[in-house]
Amino acid sequence: MKYKIFASTTPQTEPVLNKLRAVLKTWQAVENGYEYVFVLGGDGFFVSTLANYNCDSCKVVGINTGHIGFYTSFNGDDLDENFISKLTSFEFKKINLLEVKTKNHSFLVLNELAVYTNTAYPINIFIDDNHWESYRGSGLLIGPRTGSTALAKSAKGAVIFPNVDVVQIIELNPLLHPNQITIQSPIILPMQTKVEFRIKKAFKAEQFPNFYADGIKLDLKNEDTSISFQLVLSRSMFHASLKTKDFIDKLKSTFIKQS
């Protein structure tokens, strides 16, 4: 088998990386044409790697060396003499990512696209070409199911379980007065839904909102802007447990503390 490894540079990753290389000694490390991609790190590193290496039909294996591991199926303790046999017996599936399109660019999002504005700049939201609301406030988040345990959760969004493929929109600190009232609740939309944000050119460039795709700032000019969103299948295939119990266990170990 041909493989490629992407590893974070954290101290705790290095021993796991060496262990993985030893386990894969009968496989061939290559730069192109790989069948497996191993991503060693936390969820943040996994997200940034996926954005750059969404390869056709390759199998992506996440090995957690960070604190949170919603996107990883293994940790360093799993890298034993049975690892390869377990790995080759697993089912890998494509997952839904959020495709983001602007006038000149198209890219994929695993967690969320975030819009921030410090001037409560108006953003018109359309759902399947129907005007939903004219939002004013600190910003907006939009993302697929996979992002519901990331920034969306911190913004009081819904935690969405596996096998529920939806798009979620969350308002951040909406501006409210008698003539400006928005929904103020997370919106969950079916996977086929097309969402569009429309923003007019600002009088001053510094008033125009800032846009971040999975934490990376987008270079969008101060002009009349339309950004569309829709779920699409990834090109890569992933192994991550879709069992309710496994997801609950991760949620409890990460977020829930009770005596």
From Swiss-Prot:
GO terms for molecular function: ATP binding; metal ion binding; NAD binding; NAD+ kinase activity. GO terms for cellular component: cytoplasm. Its EC number is 2.7.1.23. This is NAD kinase. Belongs to the NAD kinase family. InterPro entries: ATP-NAD_kinase_N (IPR017438), ATP-NAD_kinase_PpnK-typ_C (IPR017437), NAD/diacylglycerol_kinase_sf (IPR016064), NADK (IPR002504). The active site is at D43 (proton acceptor). It catalyses: NAD(+) + ATP = ADP + NADP(+) + H(+). GO terms for biological process: NAD metabolic process; NADP biosynthetic process. Transmembrane segments: none annotated. The lineage of its organism: Bacteria, Bacillati, Mycoplasmatota, Mycoplasmoidales, Mycoplasmoidaceae. Involved in the regulation of the intracellular balance of NAD and NADP, and is a key enzyme in the biosynthesis of NADP. Catalyzes specifically the phosphorylation on 2'-hydroxyl of the adenosine moiety of NAD to yield NADP.
